[in-house]
């Protein structure tokens, strides 16, 4: 029994040991399998992530290759989607196969878990401990290295500070030695000048005082400063504070000093200050140190608005100072520069521009397979005329342009089925990077012809950041056309993520500036407002450095409206290798020659000939006098008002275009300003109440109706007084294949017959330009004519070329130069008096009234001339006596009417005129009346000006020069503000 029980216990013990071992082995296996499972899952996640990246890269590579080869250009959208689906399906199947292989591999690893022993656990534990120890050791090493680096940096910084401190001490010691050497070389100063600073505060200190002050500076570490004030005595302070030897009395020492010393001297100086200023340099001589140092304001105790400030009124200037003799005309030209002149030119040779791509066009096979005869026939069908070398062939469908899918989808949503004639030819040319001139009738889709290539051009360049200028710049003549182009661009730019900003006058400039500062790819603008923006804040708002695509819409109208200087200056500031596009409904020869200066080997496109009215417009021309036009207009309104909108062109604008376009009213009465770019839906009738003054204006007026394939009607009233406009109307009707009324043809033929006979003169085209150019050539011609006239009268040296009537400082009491000229004229014709006795009578003022003076008998020939000379001499002598009786004084004028309002207010205010009058000794008064720009004063009236009068010529010149300086400062401040100088800017519509 005992043996059995022992054997049983032994077996139980063995079973327990065996079970313990099995449990330990099982736990170890589970832990190892769990670790391996985590490692395999991590590997699976990494592999899946790598597969995703590779699939995305392959997908992008596929899209890039397909775009580069142009495989999807000739196929439809369904084929591209089907190929893309097949490719993605194969990729998904490949990824599923790789996942299945990974699962099988995991199963095999789990089946090997029973074969592992406990020794593996021990090895794993030891390995983990070694790894942890090595990691802790690496952390300690890194921490020690970081601390050492910080200590080294602190040591270097301390050494650098010590070096700088030593340099400062050496510099201070060297400066002190130089000052001592200068004082010793000068020797002791004799004499002392009294000033308002007090007796103890001399103008020049003694050597002992300077030494004491210097010692004080050194004791205080070189940081003490000398502070000088008007009523403060110099006090030397020791390092320990020193004792003050000043006792307070019942009377304040400062009050006693002011009452006894300062106030009497101030009264004396106030009596002589004006005389002292006026006598300074008046006699042309200076004495003592003042001849070298100039006028000392502090010596007089007068400091006006801050001493030694450039903006204050300085001492009177000598006669030789060129600023006093500046011509008023040159001053006005310098101060009142236009915004175009203030925009400085850019030297492109000093700027490294980044290269950009122009050519995006790849001709599809359908177009390249066409023969030249087929291309010519297609252009003839579209009524296209092309001038240029290697012109790309016109396209037939939108997908042949090479535009992105987003643009094509937008075209499909807008129901643009196929390109219009101007678009079919312009898109390949502009997409090829060529400069282009597009001439097409109104409503033919010119806007889309330059907008679509611009979007593709912009997407190829790096994105715009804040502070960068635009990439595409579109200029138009009127704000209505700018708004219309902006709305057309917004239809496509929204899908592409491109920002467009309109810049035009008549609206708040603050919002436009904020949008430009944020960065924009496209700017649609009028030339005048764009110049304003570029000049504001010295060009910090935006710039033209990134502009590579320039568009001028209605270019002929911009040149005709006088925007040529602004356009030229803007174009000159854009990089020379830009792409330039010009579009318009009309393009006269004069403007074409001017426009080609800004283009580089352009291709010209014409649709339907040059300046032709759309054939879809029914044109009626009626001969009606002024009295019958209004009743006829009422008949037309009663007939057409219910059919749609009506536009009436007259010489004055009565209604607003915004109400007309927003269906507030169906009738708009406007001038030719509305004839350009105005696109109003459902506009059925156009009435020319007043006949247009040239052919191009008629084409644009009539072109407001019949747009985008719609029908329209145009009625024009003309009378016998408007016969000079009849030939243009007949020409427009004939070119557009419309019937010409017999009475209109008769009026036109009658007028042309009068022109051939020389009775009448044909009017201009409206694009020749008129008025003054205000350039240097015109100034030279005017000065040459003035000089020739003076030479003819024998007074060539009397005045210089730069002098103007208003710039001359003249003596008061009249000028006898006119009488001298009269005498010269009489003497010049004395020799020929017998042949032409009447000539002298015509030259004298008041019709030769001198010959009928009492006591002078009317004679003929030389006797009559001698009598006239004697009478003129008597008048001259009397005028001289009268002038001598009046005290001598001088006067001058300065016109301020055309300056900005702020400048006029400043220069006429008593706070400005008072100090100038007191300082110069001249009297300044405001005369004349303010006239707005464009208004002409009457015969007895004058524009606003300042009248300066003084006892000496130098006083008048000095006062006038100071007034000019004030005007210039305020004018420049006004121009530097956004939208400043409202009175001097051009009208931007």
UniProtKB/Swiss-Prot annotation:
Q motif, short sequence motif: residues: 396-424
Motif DEAD box location, chain numbering: 553-556
GO terms of molecular function: ATP binding; ATP hydrolysis activity; RNA binding; RNA helicase activity
Compositional bias segments (type: Acidic residues): 321-330
Family: Belongs to the DEAD box helicase family. DDX46/PRP5 subfamily.
UniProt domain comment: The Q motif is unique to and characteristic of the DEAD box family of RNA helicases and controls ATP binding and hydrolysis.
Protein's name according to its UniProt entry: DEAD-box ATP-dependent RNA helicase 45
Gene for this chain: RH45
């Amino acid at each position: 029994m005992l043996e059995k029980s022992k054997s049983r216990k032994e077996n139980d013990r063995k079973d327990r040991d065996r079970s313990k071992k099995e449990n330990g082995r099982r736990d170890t296996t589970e832990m190892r399998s769990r670790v391996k499972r985590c490692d395999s899952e991590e590997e699976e996640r990494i592999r899946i992530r790598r597969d995703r990246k590779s699939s995305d890269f392959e997908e992008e590579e596929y899209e890039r290759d397909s775009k580069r080869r142009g495989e999807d250009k000739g196929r439809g959208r369904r084929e591209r989607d089907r190929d893309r689906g097949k490719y993605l399906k194969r990729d998904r199947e490949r990824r599923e196969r790789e996942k299945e292989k990974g699962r099988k591999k995991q199963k095999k690893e789990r089946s090997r878990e029973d074969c592992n022993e406990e020794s593996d656990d021990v090895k794993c534990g030891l390995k983990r401990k070694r790894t942890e120890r090595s990691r802790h050791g690496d952390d300690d090493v890194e921490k020690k290295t970081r601390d050492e680096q910080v200590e080294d940096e602190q040591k270097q910084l301390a050494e650098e500070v010590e070096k700088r401190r030593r340099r400062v001490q050496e510099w201070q010691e060297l400066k002190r030695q130089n000052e001592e050497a200068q004082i010793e070389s000068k020797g002791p100063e004799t004499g002392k000048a009294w000033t308002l600073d007090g007796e103890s505060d001399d103008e020049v200190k003694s050597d002992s005082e300077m030494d004491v002050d210097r010692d004080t500076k050194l004791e205080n570490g070189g940081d003490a400063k000398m502070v000088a004030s008007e009523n403060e005595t110099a006090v030397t302070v020791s390092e320990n504070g020193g004792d003050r030897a000043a006792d307070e009395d019942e009377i304040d020492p400062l009050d006693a000093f002011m009452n006894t010393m300062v106030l009497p001297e101030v009264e004396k100086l106030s009596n002589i200050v004006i005389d002292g200023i006026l006598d300074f340099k008046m006699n042309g001589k200076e004495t003592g140190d003042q001849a070298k140092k100039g006028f000392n304001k502090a010596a007089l105790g007068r400091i006006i608005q801050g001493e030694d400030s450039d903006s204050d009124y300085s001492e009177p200037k000598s006669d030789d100072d060129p600023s006093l003799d500046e011509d008023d005309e040159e001053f006005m030209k310098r101060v009142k520069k236009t915004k175009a002149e203030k925009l400085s030119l850019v030297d492109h040779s000093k700027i490294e521009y980044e290269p950009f791509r122009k050519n995006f066009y790849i001709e599809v096979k359908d177009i390249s397979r066409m023969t030249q005869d087929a291309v010519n026939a297609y252009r003839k069908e579209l009524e296209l005329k092309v001038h240029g070398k290697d012109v790309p062939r016109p396209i037939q469908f939108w997908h042949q342009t090479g535009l992105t899918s987003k643009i094509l989808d937008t075209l499909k949503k807008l129901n643009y089925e196929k390109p219009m004639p101007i678009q079919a030819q312009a898109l390949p040319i502009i997409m090829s990077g060529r400069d282009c001139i597009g001439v097409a009738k109104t409503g033919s889709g010119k806007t889309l012809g330059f907008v679509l290539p611009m979007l593709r051009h912009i997407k190829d360049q790096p994105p715009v950041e804040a502070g960068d200028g635009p990439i595409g710049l579109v200029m138009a003549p009127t704000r209505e056309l700018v708004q219309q182009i902006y709305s057309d661009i917004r239809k496509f730019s929204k899908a592409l993520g491109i920002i467009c900003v309109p810049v035009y006058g008549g609206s708040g400039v603050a919002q436009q500036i904020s949008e430009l500062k944020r960065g924009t790819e496209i700017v649609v603008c009028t030339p005048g407002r764009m110049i304003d923006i570029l000049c504001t804040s010295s060009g910090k708002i935006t710039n033209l450095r990134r502009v590579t695509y320039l568009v001028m819409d209605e270019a002929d109208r911009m040149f005709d409206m006088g925007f040529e200087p602004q356009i030229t200056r803007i174009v000159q500031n854009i990089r020379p290798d830009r792409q330039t596009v010009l579009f318009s409904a009309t393009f006269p020869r004069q403007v074409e020659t001017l426009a080609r200066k800004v283009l580089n080997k352009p291709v010209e496109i014409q649709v339907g000939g040059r300046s032709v009215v759309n054939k879809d417009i029914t044109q009626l021309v009626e001969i009606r006098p002024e009295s019958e036009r209004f009743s006829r207009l009422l008949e037309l309104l009663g007939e057409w008002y219910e059919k749609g909108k009506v536009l009436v062109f007259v010489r004055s604008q009565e209604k607003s275009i915004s109400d007309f376009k927003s269906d507030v009213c169906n009738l708009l009465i406007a001038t030719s300003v509305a004839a350009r770019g105005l696109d109003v839906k459902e506009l059925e009738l156009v009435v020319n109440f007043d006949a247009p003054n040239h052919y191009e204006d008629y084409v644009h007026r009539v072109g407001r109706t019949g747009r985008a394939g719609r029908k329209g009607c145009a009625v024009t009233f003309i009378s016998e007084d408007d016969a000079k406009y009849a030939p243009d109307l007949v020409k427009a009707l004939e070119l557009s294949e419309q019937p010409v009324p017999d009475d209109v043809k008769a009026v036109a033929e009658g007028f042309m017959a009068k022109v051939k006979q020389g009775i009448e003169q044909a009017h201009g085209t409206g694009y020749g330009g008129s008025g003054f150019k205000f350039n240097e050539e015109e100034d030279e011609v005017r000065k040459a004519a003035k000089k020739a006239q003076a030479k003819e009268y024998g007074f060539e040296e009397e005045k210089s070329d730069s002098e103007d009537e208003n710039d001359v400082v003249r003596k008061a009491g009249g000028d006898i130069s006119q009488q001298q000229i009269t005498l010269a004229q009489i003497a010049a014709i004395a020799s020929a008096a017998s042949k032409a006795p009447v000539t002298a009578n015509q030259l004298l003022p008041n019709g030769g009234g001198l010959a009928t003076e009492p006591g002078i008998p009317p004679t003929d020939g030389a006797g009559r001339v001698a009598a006239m000379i004697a009478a003129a001499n008597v008048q001259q002598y009397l005028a001289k006596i009268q002038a001598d009786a009046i005290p001598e004084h001088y006067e001058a004028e300065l016109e301020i009417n055309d300056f900005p309002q702020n400048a006029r207010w400043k220069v006429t205010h008593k706070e400005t005129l008072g100090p100038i009058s007191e300082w110069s000794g001249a009297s300044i008064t405001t005369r004349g009346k303010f006239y707005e720009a464009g208004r002409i004063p009457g015969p007895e009236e004058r524009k606003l000006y300042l009248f300066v009068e003084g006892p000496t010529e130098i006083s008048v010149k000095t006062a006038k020069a100071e007034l000019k300086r004030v005007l210039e400062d305020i004018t420049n401040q006004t121009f530097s503000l956004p939208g400043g100088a409202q009175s001097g800017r051009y009208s931007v519509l």
